[in-house]
């Protein structure tokens, strides 16, 4: 499996040798690529687990859930924000546990915003805590591994009253009110901690698949095509004939 560089992509020679080509369908007009390692994680996850077709909807934005990212590393959080923007999110909640996104040093904020491609990323980041889970009717926590229901089997296109949480560990979930949340798993290898940007990017890709793209409307009436057109002559070349004169013929 070959994954293209985010700036140059794959070479023509490599593409010509490919048996299959997979395109990750980003939905942003400004952030159109993922971090290359995150893209490899998304591609590898779908290659191993398969995928249904991407949905089509009249109003995909209405189906997109809210997203809460829990993170302590500023670069991982920034890369996750980049993926969120690429997959069509405009707002994200952040439980900042030392990532310094809101109050870190200038160097930390600069690195985090660089990872998020902040210069062209219109994403709005809102400060949040675990107490904010109570504001939502439906909360789904996504873990990187475990025996929980696979993420593909969960519906993650229920709109803004649904919250998807990424970045919590199994121990954190045990401290939450069990009756108020559901838990899904990506099914990654146990015992190996995956970076936050991998877990977030895979989750965001599955959300984008279920939320879908805008359904195209009926095609418009095509403009008429002409094989020839009348070319108007100058007034000097025009002879006006009175209809009464034609009666003499």
Residues of each region from the PLM?
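Active-site/ligand-binding-proximal alpha/beta "capping" segment
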Residues: 1-26, 52, 145-187
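Conserved residues at beta->alpha junctions
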Residues: 5, 71, 190
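Residues that form or flank phosphate/diphosphate-binding pockets in enzymes
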Residues: 9-10, 75, 194-195
